[in-house]
């Protein structure tokens, strides 16, 4: 084995020189230069500095403006809540431990950080699944006269939390475990060892199949069918131009969210699967650190996409930030009105664009 396994940790360095120490008790500066830990801390501070305001603003603006409180927006707000979980439960912890050079918060802190990071990522993934299914149901109409209502949105929210908990909770109760990874300043699922009594192998397979591959298959199926339906509707001119345009805008926004999720999380998932299938092989601390910390940036892209691609939300956000008056409203009056009308063709089936 090209690493050192201890009680509740695995360090990717053979302890031939005797310098390897527990990541819960000693700085890990023998793994990489101390400056790298400072850089990680600064990176996490940047994510907090951006992630908290944009996600909180998304929640606040939607709650303040009644016209934004549509069923589909409930799911988008769910993404903001998940991101805030990651910011408060994960990022603050990781920034603090990076500043110390080791996981100074001990096993409890590791469990909390790993849990919140996993929970937030899974809520985001399953929210994208619900959005994909909603787009498929509304645009492709496999069920005639289907309207995505408040009851559907609430069921979708409950579904995302149940599925996320089904992935994040088991390591807390003995099916696998959370351990420090990479530079030993953040925690994740134990892909690294076959520690006796934790059944890591079965949990990792369960997680990859049920909480990564199956959701992605559902998403790709829905958007494959969606693409075909949009082309057919455009060719047949079955719906009004404003309705088609509004549905395309919403679908485009959700597709970009899915692509951004894949860009952020696929490197981490790929490296984790490689480590799991090549346990004992040689790899450095940075091998897992880069994809793990890159995945954490997912907390800021969803609200940024939402703000950039949803003109109605942008107008409401500017109004909120400017104390109830939008200084650009007069300049964009006619354009904004036409866009709002297009986005409001059917609040239950076309929101939130």
Curated annotation (Swiss-Prot):
Glycans are attached at residues 2, 15, 200. It comes from the Eukaryota. The modification N6-(retinylidene)lysine is found at residue 296. Gene3D superfamilies: Rhodopsin 7-helix transmembrane proteins. It is found in: Membrane; Cell projection, Cilium, Photoreceptor outer segment. The record marks 113 as: Plays an important role in the conformation switch to the active conformation. A motif ('Ionic lock' involved in activated form stabilization) lies at residues 134-136. The keyword Endoplasmic reticulum does not apply. Residues 1-36, 97-110, 174-202, 275-286 are extracellular. A lipid is attached at residues 322-323 (S-palmitoyl cysteine). Belongs to the G-protein coupled receptor 1 family. Opsin subfamily. This is Rhodopsin. It comes from Chelon auratus. The lineage of its organism: Eukaryota, Metazoa, Chordata, Craniata, Vertebrata.
